[in-house]
Amino acid sequence: MTTVALDVQNRAAKTTEYDVEDIEYLRHGDKPLLARVFKPRGNGPFPALVEVHGGAWCLSDRKTEHLRHEFMAAHGIVSFALDFRSGETDPYPASLQDINFAVRFVKLHASEFKTRPQLIGLSGQSSGGHLAMLVAMRPHDPRYAAIALPPGAPAHDATVGAVVMSWPVINPLGRYRHAKRALAGVNPAEWPKSIIARHDSYWRSEANMAEGNPMLALERGEKVQTPPAVWFQGGGDTLHDYKDADSDFPGNEPQRFVANYRKAGGEIELHYLDMDRHAGHAPDLSKTGDMFGRMVEWLGRNVTLGVG
């Protein structure tokens, strides 16, 4: 088999029109789960990102990070922005089941979305970055793949060709304990209270935080998939870029994960951004500098179309 690099890098220099629609991709009882699809005009095939929003596993929805989705679509990348079950009502691994299904759903309907199965990646921000990476690393995990495609549908799995992460919570257990230490300090800030509560709501136990953990899975030597990945990180971000007091690794969490991922055979880049993150406040995606452009450029180098 040979591969042909898609002309996404050139698309970064120009924009295209796109269409937006909400579709129901999954239903739990009488509750539909929607995806907002941003689809470039033209014939394709286009790369596609299944987009996983942040919000400490409990908050936000498919509309929250629309600036990123709009930019991707305007530069020739299909954006499939998900709603999924909230950790406020459905604990781990419910959201992972929805996301795993969504990847398979997009593959099943690839021609309708002007893409192909081998052009599909995952993208996520904060807790969404954690979920995206965990689905990518464990595409065949029977817990995550528990929701079947419709009867008679062709078989598809949740393997992806790329993972794009923005300040992911890559180590839920480490972040939980980091927040608890911050709360126990002198004159603690407010952010640890809400972070701890949402960890508790979604994970229910430290054992689950350790098990559903991309960082610790690699350090345990778990056999996982390691598709090409990129981590974008803002400066001054004490919620995602900190030294884990329980680890002997000399650097912060981003550097630790990059080292582990490469040791496992994966290719990953770490990009620091000229933006400030403030604990307890949602990031302003209009002030992330050239992050979106860098994402498009990275996809142009890493998403390929198999031929033959």
Q: Which stretches of residues belong to each language-model region?
A:
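N-terminal cap/lid segment of alpha/beta-hydrolase-fold proteins
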Residues: 2-43
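Mobile cap/lid helix-loop segments that gate and shape the active-site cleft of serine hydrolases
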Residues: 9-17, 144-149, 174-221
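C-terminal catalytic histidine-bearing segment of alpha/beta-hydrolase fold enzymes
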Residues: 36, 230-242, 251, 255-308
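Short beta-strand element of the alpha/beta-hydrolase
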Residues: 45-55
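Short amphipathic alpha-helix adjacent to the substrate-entry channel of hydrolases
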Residues: 63-81
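Alpha/beta-hydrolase active-site loop
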Residues: 90-111
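Primarily recognizes the serine-hydrolase "nucleophile elbow" in alpha/beta-hydrolase
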Residues: 104-181
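The feature captures the conserved acid-bearing segment of alpha/beta-hydrolase catalytic domains
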Residues: 150-177, 201-244
